[in-house]
From Swiss-Prot:
Entry-linked SMART domains: REC
GO annotation (BP), single: chemotaxis
Protein name as catalogued: Chemotaxis protein CheY
Keywords: Acetylation, Chemotaxis, Cytoplasm, Flagellar rotation, Magnesium, Metal-binding, Phosphoprotein, Two-component regulatory system
Length: 129
């Protein structure tokens, strides 16, 4: 079972979606959740440190989720952060692109709390969290 004090950053340009993900994480016992509205905002927050997990949308202005993922993976300090992509992009090529860029997991919107929990648990298990 993962540490319930893990610090999550939820990245999505749609505030309602950020709130939904935040509330689902709270239902799962994770209360340490912050939000960012795009990849640029997310990177600024991530670089201040202290985050344990990123949940990111794909389609966002300024810097999309795939570019955010690639930037995180290329950053020495952030490179090992687990990143779960939560997106409406259900095409096989998108899922492959995210996997090749180093996504820890992929959830297609809309999704349930059970789906989110299952994906998180797989990532926690794989990373020994």
């Amino acid at each position: 079972m993962a540490d319930k004090n893990l610090r999550f950053l939820v990245v999505d340009d749609f505030s309602t979606m950020r709130r939904i993900v935040r509330n689902l994480l709270k239902e799962l016992g994770f209360n340490n959740v912050e939000e960012a509205e795009d990849g640029v905002d997310a990177l600024n927050k991530l670089r201040t440190g202290g985050f344990d997990f990123v949940v990111s949308d794909w389609n966002m202005p300024n810097m999309d989720g795939l570019d955010l993922l690639k930037t995180i993976r290329a950053d020495g300090a952030l490179g090992t952060l687990p990143v779960l992509m939560v997106t409406a992009e259900a095409k096989k090529e998108n899922i492959i692109a995210a996997a090749q860029a180093g996504a820890s997991g992929y959830v297609v919107k809309p999704f349930t709390a059970a789906t989110l929990e299952e994906k998180l648990n797989k990532i926690f298990e794989k990373l020994g969290m």
